[in-house]
């Protein structure tokens, strides 16, 4: 999983533990580890949600000011399906 530069340090510190992604299909899998900094994130869950499920509180938990801010970043390519990805940072990597 890739994160914008401003989100990387909060993810590493454990302040952000979920991400909303708009894809055609999931690009990650539960249990998968993805490099970030000197460690990696391990995906603990992924589930499809609706746009109406993206609340201001969920946007803040994902590291954004609000829903509009999140939606500007969440869309990757032509996808229209919304996924909530939960993860934990593993400082020792993969």
Regions inferred by a protein language model and the residue ranges of each:
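Mixed-charge, low-complexity intrinsically disordered regions
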Residues: 1-94
């Amino acid at each position: 999983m890739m994160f914008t530069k401003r989100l990387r340090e909060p993810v590493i510190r454990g302040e952000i533990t979920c991400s909303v992604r708009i894809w055609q299909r999931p690009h990650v899998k539960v249990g998968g580890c993805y490099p970030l900094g000197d460690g990696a994130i391990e995906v603990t869950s992924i589930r499809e949600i609706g746009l109406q499920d993206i609340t201001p509180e969920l946007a803040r938990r994902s590291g954004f000011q609000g829903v509009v801010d999140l939606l500007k970043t969440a869309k990757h390519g032509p996808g229209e399906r919304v996924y909530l990805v939960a993860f934990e940072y593993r400082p020792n990597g993969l």
